[in-house]
Amino acid sequence: MKILLIGGSCSLINNLIVKFKKEGHRVSLLTGERYQKKKYEKVFETYNFTYDSEKLSDIIDSVNPDVTICMGAFDSNYRWKEEHEAVKVSSHLVNILMACTQEKKGKVIYLSSDEVYYGDHEEKLQEESPLSGKGVRASMLIQAESICQNFQKNWGLDLTVLRLDHLYNQPKRPEDVNHIGALMCLEALKTGCITVQENHDFSLLNEKDAVEFIYCIAKEPQKHEI
C-alpha cells in the first residue's frame, strides 16, 4: 500500500512510519510546516507544506495514497490549549479533506481521542453516544469529528474516525509528558504520592497497541465510519 501520513512529529507518527515500512508499505509524509524543524523516521517522500497550501491536491495526486492518515488529536503542529487555534484546526482539516475528496485517492483515517467524552458514564460508551467533551481541546476535536461526518455523508468520502482511548507511551522528551500515565508518574516524583479519583475507572491504550489497531483498519478494505 501507499500511505500518506499527515502531522507534526511525535512518538505516534514515528511508530506508524516504522510499522508500515516494516510491513513493506511505501510511506510518504506531509509535515504541515514549510521548513521541517522536527525529526521523523525516514520515509519515501517528505512534503514540507502547510495545511492551507494550494499544493495539497497536487501532493495527494503525486502520492496516490491507498490510505491517508491524519494525526488529528495527536498532531504536534497545534497548540491545543489555546482557543485561537480552533479556527486553524477546523480550516486546515477542511482543506485536507477537500483535497482528498477532489483527488478521490483511497480512504482517510482521522485520529481523535476519548476527550470528546467528559465525566462518568454508567453505561458503556458506543459509537453513537452523544459527545460531551469539556475544554478547548475537546471542543476542537468535537468540531473536527463533525467536519469528518459531513465529508462522509455529503461528499461520499471513505473516512474513518478512530478515537484512541487514554493513549500512553514511555516519554522520551519533555513534550511527551502529556498523558495521564506520565503525568501521574511526574506527580509521584514531585510530591511522593499519586492522587486518584474514587470510583473512577477507565482503560488505557498503549501506543504500540494503538499502532497495531490503526494498521488493521488501514489494510481493511471495507468502509468505516467511527
Annotate the PLM regions:
Residues I3-E23:
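N-terminal Rossmann NAD(P)H-binding glycine-rich loop of SDR-like oxidoreductase domains
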Residues H25-R34:
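Conserved glycine-rich Rossmann-like NAD(P)H-binding loop of the short-chain dehydrogenase/reductase
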Residues Y40, Y78-H84, G119-E123, R173:
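Conserved catalytic-core motifs of eukaryotic protein kinase domains, centered on the activation segment
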Residues F49-K88:
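NAD(P)H-binding glycine-rich loop region in Rossmannoid oxidoreductase-like domains
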Residues D61, W80-V94, M98, K105, ...:
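Catalytic Tyr-X3-Lys loop
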Residues A86-V87, S129, G133-E145, E175-A182, ...:
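Short-chain dehydrogenase/reductase
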